[in-house]
């Protein structure tokens, strides 16, 4: 995806390295993708996914740098082939999709996992300790560099009109349910209740604030079930319509549940509210590496009333981050200097491949 860590690292390389340094750096993307326009200007350094050139370059690459498993380099991942075997032998620097903390991934991305990699980029001391103690890496293979995409983050919220970004994650246990089953699920009922809450509407009205609901693709088909009853202070934005990082930069506060986007918003010193009404089910299904009941930053709620108390407090106090969260940030974010991509490149340059 040409919005994520892989894209921003590639962009840094194209715009900051000399011709010799960037000569052999390439970005793979399907030319039919909506994101292709973001990288088209880099010409010969952009390779069409599953093209002949792509296959040839897979065979000869020194290292894969990606925000997902290197298995995604190839469309037919389940079928044995010469290309698949070649990918398996290549080293990978994992840039990550989001901070590893709120969801256990060691069975997939751990050193002994099904999609292990040689190098695992981390963002601070807390995450590096997770990578070492839970995933099996070490200080050399889990360097603290920060995320490439964080280099472009800046606070763009407007004083004229504040908005709260609501971005819940999907639930794996709802993956195969029917429409009727979904509509009686706690997940649907809780978010439907929140979005139609008269109290929420009053808070938004009294503080001249909007709520922007960024819709997960798997939730999109159900929006019309309650959309008509919702206040005009609630806006729905389908996934992909506006770049997510743009929404995070413009928002005044985030409401999520278990999504790793919370770290991006926290990185910008903005308040984060966690609505975890189904925490026990989530913890049983996925687990986490930190105790979310006791050690989570931000404000955590398991009921709508508690969540709205927090919404009201922050809306009435200018959406200023809690002091305890501001003081805790350095243990999560080693760097906030817009040089994360440079550190990643320096790490690559200083290691033999």
Regions found by a protein language model. Name each.
Residues 1-153:
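Active-site and donor-binding regions of nucleotide-sugar-utilizing enzymes
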Residues 22-26, 115-120, 211, 250-253, ...:
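Short active-site oxyanion
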Residues 47-56, 217-263:
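Donor nucleotide-activated moiety binding/catalytic core segment of transferases
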């Amino acid at each position: 995806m040409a919005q994520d860590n892989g894209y921003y690292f590639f962009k840094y390389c194209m715009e900051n390295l000399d011709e010799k340094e960037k000569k052999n750096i390439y970005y793979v993307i399907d030319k039919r993708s909506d994101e292709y326009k973001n990288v088209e200007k880099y010409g010969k350094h952009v390779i069409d996914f599953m093209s002949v050139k792509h296959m040839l370059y897979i065979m000869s690459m020194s290292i894969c740098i990606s925000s997902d498993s290197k298995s995604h380099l190839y469309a037919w991942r389940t079928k044995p082939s010469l290309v698949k075997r070649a990918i398996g032998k290549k080293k990978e620097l994992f840039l990550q999709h989001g901070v590893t903390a709120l969801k256990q991934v060691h069975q997939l991305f751990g050193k002994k996992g099904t999609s292990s990699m040689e190098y695992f980029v981390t963002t601070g001391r807390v995450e590096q300790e997770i990578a070492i103690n839970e995933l099996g890496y070490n200080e050399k293979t889990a360097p603290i560099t920060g995320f490439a995409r964080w280099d472009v983050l800046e606070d763009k919220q407007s004083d004229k009109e504040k908005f709260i970004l609501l971005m819940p994650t999907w639930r794996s246990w709802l993956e195969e349910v029917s429409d009727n089953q979904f509509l009686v699920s706690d997940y649907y009922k809780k978010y439907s209740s929140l979005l139609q809450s008269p109290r929420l509407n009053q808070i938004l009205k009294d503080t001249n604030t909007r709520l922007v609901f960024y819709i997960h693709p798997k939730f999109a088909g159900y929006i019309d079930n309650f959309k008509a009853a919702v206040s005009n202070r609630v806006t729905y934005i389908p996934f992909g319509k506006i770049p997510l990082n743009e929404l995070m930069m413009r928002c005044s506060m985030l409401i999520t549940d278990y999504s790793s986007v919370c770290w991006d918003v926290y990185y910008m010193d903005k308040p984060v509210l966690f609505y975890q009404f189904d925490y026990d089910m989530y913890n049983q299904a996925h687990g986490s590496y930190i105790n979310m009941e006791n050690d989570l930053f931000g404000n955590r709620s398991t009921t709508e009333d508690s969540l709205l108390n927090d919404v009201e407090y922050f809306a009435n106090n200018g959406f200023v981050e809690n002091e305890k969260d501001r003081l805790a940030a350095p243990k999560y974010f080693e760097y906030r200097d817009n040089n994360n991509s440079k550190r990643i490149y320096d790490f690559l340059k200083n290691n033999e491949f």
